[in-house]
Structures are given as C-alpha cells and as structure tokens.
C-alpha cells in the first residue's frame, strides 16, 4: 500500500479521495484535475503519472504528492490540505488565508473526513506513520 510505503496517513488519503472525486476513478474537474485524487496535469507529469484514470498510478502519484507536502509543511494537516487544493506555491507564500472561504471550507471538510476515517482505520493508522498530524 502506497500510504504505508510513503508514511502518509491512510485516513488522509481516503479523505482526499472522498472529497476530490467521491471515489470516481476517472473523474475530471472543471479545472482539468483527473482521477481519484484529482491530479492536475502538471502535477501528474511532475510525479510521473502517465494516465490519471489508472487507479494505481493516480493513487501512487497522489500519495507521493501528499508525502512531499507533509515534508514541506511540517505535517500540518491544514497547510497540507490547502496546498493540495490550491497548490503548494500559494500556501508557501501566503500560508492559510482566512479571507478565502473556499480554501478554509475545503480544509475543514478534509479535516472532518480525516477524523472520521481515522476512527474507522485505527489499526491501519498505527502502522502507517508515527508522525503527528496537527
């Protein structure tokens, strides 16, 4: 499992998939993001994902991206979720802008889904990562 290999919370991966694509493997957003984890084309290319509708490639790329964001933002779930949603450059420059309701709402939904998933995946979580997610 990619989450275990990259030391990313299984619950976080599931929360992202739930909120991004509602588990639709070939979902395409109005902005052009594709697949379960809704990878933007440039991000997919950067991660070596050739076919974003391929479940294995999409999840592998999405989990690697989350692992990278977790390192960049020191495991702060709010910043990781915001970075996943609007891009790491914007979050690195501005942090969390509480003037942007859309980003704040997305982060809140990810956190709520994460907490719910963590309760259901307690055994998987303990083996996935020892990192603390705030």
Predicted regions and their residues:
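Catalytic glycan-binding domains that act on GlcNAc-containing polysaccharides
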Residues: 1-134
């Amino acid at each position: 499992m990619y989450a275990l290999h990259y030391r990313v919370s299984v619950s976080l991966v599931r929360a992202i998939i739930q909120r991004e694509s509602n588990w639709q493997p070939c979902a395409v957003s109005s902005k052009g993001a594709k697949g379960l984890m809704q990878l933007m084309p440039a991000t997919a290319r950067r991660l070596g994902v050739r076919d974003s509708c391929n479940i294995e490639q999409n999840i592998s790329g999405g989990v690697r991206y989350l692992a990278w964001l977790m390192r960049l933002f020191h495991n702060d779930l709010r910043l990781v979720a915001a970075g996943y949603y609007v891009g790491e450059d914007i979050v690195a420059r501005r942090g969390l802008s509480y003037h942007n309701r859309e980003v704040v709402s997305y982060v809140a939904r990810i956190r709520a889904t994460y907490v719910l998933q963590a309760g259901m995946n307690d055994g998987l979580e303990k083996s996935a990562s020892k990192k603390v997610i705030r």
